[in-house]
Amino acid sequence: MAKELKGIAASDGIAIAKAYLLVEPDLSYEKTEVTDVESEVKRFESALEVSRTELSTIREKAAKDLGEDKAQIFDAHLLVLNDPELTGPIEESIKNAKTNAETALQETTDMFIGMFESMDNEYMRERAADIKDVRKRVLSHLLGVTIPNPALIDEEVVVVAADLTPSDTAQLNRKFVKGFVTDIGGRTSHSAIMARSLEIPAVVGTKEVTASVAKNDIVIIDGLEGNVIIHPTEEQIAHYEKIKSDFALQQAEWEKLKNEKTVSKDGVHVELAANIGTPNDLEGVISNGGEAVGLYRTEFLYMGRDNFPTEEEQFEAYKAVVSGMDGKSVVVRTLDIGGDKTLPYLELPEEMNPFLGFRAIRLCFANEELFRTQLRALLRASVYGNLKIMFPMIATVNEFRQARDILLDEKAKLKAAGTEVSDSIELGIMIEIPAAAVLADQFAKEVDFFSIGTNDLIQYTMAADRMNERVSYLYQPYNPSILRLVKMVIDASHKEGKWTGMCGEMAGDQTAVPLLLGLGLDEFSMSASSILKSRSLIKRLDQSEMVKLAEEALNKSTAEEVVELVEKYTAE
């Protein structure tokens, strides 16, 4: 008998295949006393070394298949494995308590996990998740237990799991894994974001799929509407095969728009750009008809290594992207380290809330030579195309002036040395701190453009960590307060003859696109896989009608009212 579950549509598409259950292995053990503590310590160190080798291999595969930005999660896992503040106490526990390595590992990591999970900020809670993932891997090697390896799947399946860890997702082979469904998670969870990168259908947050599915059960995953059907009838299979076929035809239609400009029904042009992390991501931008790079996250050039990239290394990477876009705009964000992004070779202070602390431009000002090195590389690359530079985490006008003055100083030095530098580089800022949005009219007199980073802007405005399930209901992209801030920024830029882009998740959200078009957004920067779908939508919209929609939305009281309004407008 067919059973239907409802979850959250995380990645578009339809998948119909038998289930592959990614279940947790039995890692139970007995606490024992050891007599040869040195041998036990060596057994623990051996398990650490095997785990390091495995994670390094997984990281390389993730970088190749998903891009460097997605692979950097494994740098955090490798940091855990190499952290003497964690491994040291485990070895001391073995020696002092004469306990087996499994017990020492479990008890020591439990202490760290409990400490991190009790903290209020997202960064620290993510460290707890990293420790859990690493502990499972090390424990499996101590016990000689095989962890299910999704990379070994060699037939067409849909993966069913309580949740997917970064390690799991990075090993999914798109040739065989046609989709996945999980018990937990939301649209902005790690597994959902990875599914969109892999371009495979996914439904998350079903709550009970693992309790409802057995190995080899036929499962339908509807990543368009968030439906999951177990033991579907022939009629249901036929119905979803038709939807799958129609969606494939729809994608083929979108593909025809690849070389077209993004113009609304009434002739208003906006730019659809892509977010990238490395030069390797350019292929996806070009194949999906990206009109620009709206966000080049340069921090990924600094990750997965043991030291800072040299000026020459950075120059080559920036040159590759700028020249590769063949004259199209490339907006480069300067180094955004701190918060949830760390470097193993850069010591950062311990902070109660690193997301509100020493990060991004603040860190660059305190490490000025590091900042200057990056700016020199960018300035040298500017002659190879249409480079724009923006500074992250700007809160005050003085911060922008300080960053600009450092850049102009480096530009003058390069020119004095005979190095060619473009004189038409636009300078902008990320709008992710509410203070910058409120003061946009003053910023607009000095910057060339704004790029709204909605992920942080929403969190800071609503005082709600989107990864904290207890307050995630407050992470509301459609809250009128957020829309008013966006409108304020766009209007301020236009008043001064400047432009505004958006590079957060909201820019590629199909519910948000009509609103943003009506609010006057000039550039939408999103994952490359969302570009053609968004272009198709905008071509069907009348911008003058969307202006009316946006005006109505700004006067609503709740996010729910705004969503209802958009659905009503787009259905007509």
Curated annotation (Swiss-Prot):
It catalyses: L-histidyl-[protein] + phosphoenolpyruvate = N(pros)-phospho-L-histidyl-[protein] + pyruvate. The keyword Mitochondrion does not apply. Signal peptide: none annotated. Its EC number is 2.7.3.9. One of its GO terms (cellular component) is cytoplasm. Its cofactor is Mg(2+). Keywords: Cytoplasm, Kinase, Magnesium, Metal-binding, Phosphotransferase system, Sugar transport, Transferase, Transport. It is found in: Cytoplasm. Its main location: cytoplasm. PROSITE patterns: PEP_ENZYMES_2, PEP_ENZYMES_PHOS_SITE. The active site is at residues 190, 503. Gene3D superfamilies: Phosphoenolpyruvate-binding domains, Phosphohistidine domain, PtsI, HPr-binding domain. Phosphoenolpyruvate binds at residues 297, 333, 455-456, 466. One of its GO terms (biological process) is phosphoenolpyruvate-dependent sugar phosphotransferase system. General (non sugar-specific) component of the phosphoenolpyruvate-dependent sugar phosphotransferase system (sugar PTS). This major carbohydrate active-transport system catalyzes the phosphorylation of incoming sugar substrates concomitantly with their translocation across the cell membrane. Enzyme I transfers the phosphoryl group from phosphoenolpyruvate (PEP) to the phosphoryl carrier protein (HPr). Homodimer. The N-terminal domain contains the HPr binding site, the central domain the pyrophosphate/phosphate carrier histidine, and the C-terminal domain the pyruvate binding site. This is Phosphoenolpyruvate-protein phosphotransferase. The gene is ptsI.
